[in-house]
């Protein structure tokens, strides 16, 4: 069964610039496999789960990845352009209020 999960990855050529990868998958490593088929090898900087609310234009990130550990949010540098205009929040636990993430320096790809 698929679940809404995300990972943060970086290309070895730009190791300090992370990309937000998300989708409905069974395991976080399924996101990595699909992304690497197109973009080549990537270093993973953790991951978690997400709750996307299109009506409120929010993307709440929470939890951690069983495959890759807690998300290192300093690597949230590049986000798919279909999410531009969304407010991103992070909370360690589902159902808890989230903190708004600063996205002023994000590149929308």
Where are these regions (language model features)?
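Intrinsic low-complexity, intrinsically disordered or marginally ordered coil/linker segments
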Residues: 1-109
């Amino acid at each position: 069964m698929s679940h809404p999960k995300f990972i943060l990855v970086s290309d070895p050529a730009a190791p300090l610039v992370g990309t937000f990868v998300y989708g409905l998958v069974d395991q976080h490593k399924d996101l990595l496999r699909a992304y690497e088929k197109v973009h080549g090898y990537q270093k993973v900087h953790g991951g978690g789960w997400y709750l996307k609310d299109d009506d409120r234009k929010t993307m709440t990130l929470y939890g951690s990845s069983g495959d890759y550990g807690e998300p290192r949010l300093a690597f949230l540098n590049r986000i798919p352009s279909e999410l531009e205009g969304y407010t991103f929040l992070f909370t360690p636990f589902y159902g808890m209020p989230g903190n708004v993430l600063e996205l002023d320096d994000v590149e929308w790809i």
